Amino acid sequence: MSETPLIDAMLAEHAELEKQLADPALHADAAAARKAGRRFAMLSPIVATHRKLATARDDLATARELSADDPSFADEVTELESSIAELETQLSDMLAPRDPHDGDDILLEVKSGEGGEESALFAADLARMYIRYAERHGWKVTVLDETESDLGGYKDATLAIASKGDSADGVWSRLKFEGGVHRVQRVPVTESQGRVHTSAAGVLVYPEPEEVEEIQIDESDLRIDVYRSSGKGGQGVNTTDSAVRITHLPTGIVVTCQNERSQLQNKARAMQVLAARLQALAEEQAQADASAGRASQIRTVDRSERIRTYNFPENRITDHRVGFKAHNLDQVLDGDLDALFDALAAADRKARLQEA
């Protein structure tokens, strides 16, 4: 990878962003300031590593000159050569193509699949797992919509998960690998003979656009229905037609939101979800030819196609994409997911380096 032109462009962009962020006028537009802050946070480690590398190279040149006259500098030359090799590897890793959405917040949908009531209960377990993980990281979780099963599981649920600051590695960078079919093996609460059953639930994850206006949505393409809420949105729920269902006619995408207190708030939230799904659809279509080999999120919840298995009798979790296995399923379901996510991120980083 040739780093010089790319680094020069990044140094210039970093300097320009530093000026912009110091200008109070930028912060009058919260969305623009946040976008600039995230980009600045992404570039800062690259700039810092490049500066360390440049300094080390200068020091090496000086040490080599001195060692020609004084052999005592030979050890310093060796140390600097080792340090430079390490910094070059770090910089090469940083310059690998990044996911442009890594700093974004997300919308996450959990849907029950085959397995009836047991699948719905497992879908609720998954939703709680993500909520616990978000709480561990200090992120904000909002339940936008939920449809409960008879036993308190989730037929489907939509969560908005947002970080509370500007970071190059935001919510999407950690949870983007969760899209797909999750399989569970356990004895259902409805099983009287103690037999282990297999069922599945599906997860869809979308990066959330900074503003709905960033995504072109023609109002004439929408059918908007209102109905009485059935969720837990607090005062006003079940007394007025505050829930909103939006159907995007060209794609058939249907979005519902009922947990906000007013119809206006629910419509705004539903439009956010729709914008995220349309953005993801457009990007998926644009990348279909260029990245045909990369796995996409599985939109049909089929037990035969899965990314991960949760085996309760053996307290084992297995991610089939990277061969990750751990016997701490109880902790994982309580939000202890970092070891798994680190393994997935490492595999993704390796693939991006190979592409570069």
From Swiss-Prot:
Signal peptide: none annotated. Methylated by PrmC. Methylation increases the termination efficiency of RF1. SUPFAM superfamilies: Release factor. One of its GO terms (molecular function) is translation release factor activity, codon specific. GO terms for cellular component: cytoplasm. Pfam families: PCRF, RF-1. Keywords: Cytoplasm, Methylation, Protein biosynthesis. InterPro entries: PCRF, Pep_chain_release_fac_I, Pep_chain_release_fac_I_sf, Prokaryotic/Mito_RF, RF-1. It is found in: Cytoplasm. SMART domains: PCRF (SM00937). Its main location: cytoplasm. The modification N5-methylglutamine is found at Q235. Coiled coil: none annotated. Peptide chain release factor 1 directs the termination of translation in response to the peptide chain termination codons UAG and UAA. Belongs to the prokaryotic/mitochondrial release factor family. This is Peptide chain release factor 1. It comes from Mycobacteroides abscessus (strain ATCC 19977 / DSM 44196 / CCUG 20993 / CIP 104536 / JCM 13569 / NCTC 13031 / TMC 1543 / L948) (Mycobacterium abscessus).
